[in-house]
Amino acid sequence: MATYLIEVGTEELPADFVAAAIAQLKDRVSHSLTEYFLTPDGIEVYGTPRRLAVLIQGLPDQQADREEEIKGPPAAAAFKEGQPTKAAEGFARKQGVELSALEVRPTEKGDFVFVQKKTLGRPTPEILQELVLGWFTALEGRRFMRWADGDLRFPRPIRWLVSLWNDAVLPLELVNGSGKLEAGRISRGHRILHQGDVTLNNAADYVVTLQQAFVEVNPQVREEKIVAGVKAAAAEIGGEAEMPADLLAEVVNLVEYPTAVVGDIEAEFLELPTEVITTVMVTHQRYFAVRDRQDKTKLLPKFITISNGDPKKSEIIAAGNGRVIRARLADGQFFYRADCDEHLETYLPQLEAVTFQEELGTMRDKVDRIMEISQQIAEQLGLSEADKEIIASTAMLCKADLVTQMVYEFPELQGIMGQKYALVSGEAPAVAEGIFEHYLPRNADDILPQTLAGQVVGMGDRLDTLVSIFGLGMIPSGSSDPFALRRAANAIITVAWDAGLEIDLGELLAQGAKDFVTAHPDKTSPLEALQSFFIQRIQTLLQDEKGIDYDLVNAVLGDDAEYTERALTDLLDVGDRAAFLQSIRDDGQLAKIYATVNRSAKLAAKGNLSTDSLDPTGVINPEKFAQNSERDLYAGLVELVPTTEVARTERDYQKLIDGLAALAPTVERFFDGEDSVLVMAEDPAVRENRLNLLGLLRNHARVLADFGAIVKQ
């Protein structure tokens, strides 16, 4: 068994590309080898800022011989009166066999021509020479470039190639325009700590040889060293380091030989909000912040950076990094002090100079719309005047920090600085918290807003964006969603579910669409598109986030206007019904009533009873009963009416299920008992009466879900 190494050496690669390329190569190499009937013992993919490498262990010297049975054309097309046709000749020629090798065999679809073909295994090195460069040139990512006079695209110029089959060079040639790069056994060590070439004598020694040249090619090992180094450095200065996952993942692919270095900042900068300091450190400088071990709310006047340089020069490295961050923090300090000189409300007029979207006006216009929608939501929730005032102030000020100097310089601090400046301006803490929280959740893994102001204003902001962008016809399609509208809709639904907010989303969408058309008379109403979009988001969230079976989700959302309206009118109810259905499927209750309800619903579809009718009075004529099973079913339906009404108004669907379960034996008698009836009786009045009985049963079940959408399990 052999070991093969391919290393592609480059100029400094973007950190995000290194991580993405490693993931792509793992998948691509595995599938590629499988496609060529090669099964190695292991595949390792490595990456640093200057190289990507694949190390394949336990490769056979060649493919195994294999026999394949290949199906050809139908026998009727391949042979006419016992003689081969052009179809048979073409099939034989394509497979490289004589006509005599063709066999006719029966299949489920008739007789077909087959050939038993033996393929000799090819040498593995020969196959690799055809495949390996394609693994790299097919990589996907952003910010690709061309260099020299060639058309080859890669994030950075490729400078060297290593290709080793055990201890021998496996020749490869990368052509780029007039340039040509031939693979060998020469790699490169660390740019600073090991200047010059590194000779690789054997593919199996790749990792160790480069470690001796101060390059750790394994990103997992680099991460372990970084984590250990940062923790140790923080402990030495009496602190604990913050290590955000995103920052750690990026830093891992910024260095080849990581060393943790501690630097200092002036204590005066600690007057800045913690978020400003950590944003400068993490987002702009890729440093790790350090909190006081005794008081985690406080930052130490220190930072930890991961150096790719000489560990012996850590003091020089720390000083250089310190000068850079001090300049950034000094700017932040100036911005913060200048911004605090003004009341947050005084920034509102400046929003008139900030465009939200060309056809949708300024950010000041958007704030006005957010205020209006937020008050509509507050009215729906029946909030107190005090809560309404807090929401109104939050909505008015929620975007004011966008034009402050701090947020202009550090956009990622929007909302955070709004909260700080609101407190400095003397606004109520609830308003300040709402300004920050209205942006939550910022992504799928983020925390949710906990204050009414944050919840309501956040919904108002997102609803305005959705209605406005949909009104312009910019509806998400496929993977394209430049305005993050799916995330906005998900946030509205998730916040409502989490906080138990009984909002009428249908009414809000209708009013929003109406207001949009009033403001843009040349545009058509986006209402239907918005309704459909939100139903899709509810469906996705119930399945993917709540873990509800797909058919149960379909059952609560239905496929008609009644269910759509109900889902949008009462978001809490649709979530509750889906969760309840899942619970009674899991505990077996659903199975006990499924057949009864479904059979009734299918027959009821042949009648004309409206789906909103629950009371037998007026739709059932007891004088038309011929059997006791009809009378008992009627009596049971009469008793079920108050139960269903309670279930609907109080969302106590267990009562409804209990009522349906109690009625199930009566329904079974109606269909199959000694006093069963023929539903589709010849007498039209009798037939309608019996269909209406079943229709009423269906309608009671529909208060919970459309049982016709449920798949029997």
Curated annotation (Swiss-Prot):
GO biological process: arginyl-tRNA aminoacylation; glycyl-tRNA aminoacylation
GO molecular function: arginine-tRNA ligase activity; ATP binding; glycine-tRNA ligase activity
UniProt GO cellular component terms: cytosol
Enzyme class: ligase
Reactions catalysed: tRNA(Gly) + glycine + ATP = glycyl-tRNA(Gly) + AMP + diphosphate
Membership in a protein family: Belongs to the class-II aminoacyl-tRNA synthetase family.
Descriptive protein name: Glycine--tRNA ligase beta subunit
Organism: Picosynechococcus sp. (strain ATCC 27264 / PCC 7002 / PR-6)
Source organism phylogeny: Bacteria, Bacillati, Cyanobacteriota, Cyanophyceae, Oscillatoriophycideae
Record gene name: glyS
